[in-house]
């Protein structure tokens, strides 16, 4: 399941929910789309409860789910995560050239000048900038470098993403690692 957003407070008398969007693709939030709600740290599918989107107002970040129609029902979902299946996300979200689903980037090797620095284990958004969290290769850790480091998803650091080769080529990322 892919995190779409975090559910905030209840809004209005009809079960509206403030949605703090975590996705770059709000167009996926369409009437009739199946989503799931669960705690943000949910690991079990039993934790997920399925809903269907009634409507989403992007300008107000206001989400309405078909079976949630009172403020009391909406409050029960406050502080939970809104998720969508990877299959559903890929079906609904059309990517442009050079755009990627972050779930496809997890596990890719990070390579600079033919040296593998590590692999992407997570992607974090900090103050509107996305960062690749990279687990450093064992041989570099044994040389005293950090076990984990962050690479900003910016052209200065990211040279090329090659999904078919399962790697991300970088510039200046080794300097980040050495200074971590």
Swiss-Prot record:
GO biological process, one term: rRNA processing
Residues covered by the PRC barrel domain: 97-176
Annotated transmembrane regions: none
GO molecular function, a single term: ribosome binding
This protein's UniProt keywords: Chaperone, Cytoplasm, Ribosome biogenesis, rRNA processing
Assembly description: Binds ribosomal protein uS19.
Notes on the domains: The PRC barrel domain binds ribosomal protein uS19.
Family the entry assigns: Belongs to the RimM family.
Primary role: An accessory protein needed during the final step in the assembly of 30S ribosomal subunit, possibly for assembly of the head region. Essential for efficient processing of 16S rRNA. May be needed both before and after RbfA during the maturation of 16S rRNA. It has affinity for free ribosomal 30S subunits but not for 70S ribosomes.
Name of the protein in question: Ribosome maturation factor RimM
Organism: Helicobacter acinonychis (strain Sheeba)
Lineage per the UniProt record: Bacteria, Pseudomonadati, Campylobacterota, Epsilonproteobacteria, Campylobacterales
Designated gene of the protein: rimM
């Amino acid at each position: 399941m892919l995190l779409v957003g975090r559910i905030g407070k209840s809004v209005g008398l009809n079960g509206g929910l403030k949605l703090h969007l975590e996705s770059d693709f709000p167009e996926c939030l369409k009437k009739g789309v199946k989503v799931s709600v669960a705690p943000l740290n949910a690991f079990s599918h039993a934790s997920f409860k399925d809903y269907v989107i009634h409507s989403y107002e992007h300008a107000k970040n206001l989400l309405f789910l078909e079976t949630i129609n009172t403020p009391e029902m909406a409050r029960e979902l406050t502080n939970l995560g809104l998720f969508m299946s990877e299959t559903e996300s890929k079906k609904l979200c059309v990517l442009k050239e050079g755009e990627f689903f972050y779930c496809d980037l997890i596990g890719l090797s990070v390579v600079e000048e033919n040296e593998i620095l590590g692999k992407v284990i997570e992607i974090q958004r900090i103050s509107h900038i996305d960062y690749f969290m990279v687990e450093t290769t064992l041989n570099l850790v044994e040389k005293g470098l950090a076990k984990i480091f962050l690479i900003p998803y910016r052209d200065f650091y990211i040279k090329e993403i090659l999904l078919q080769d399962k790697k991300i080529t970088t510039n200046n990322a080794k300097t980040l690692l050495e200074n971590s």
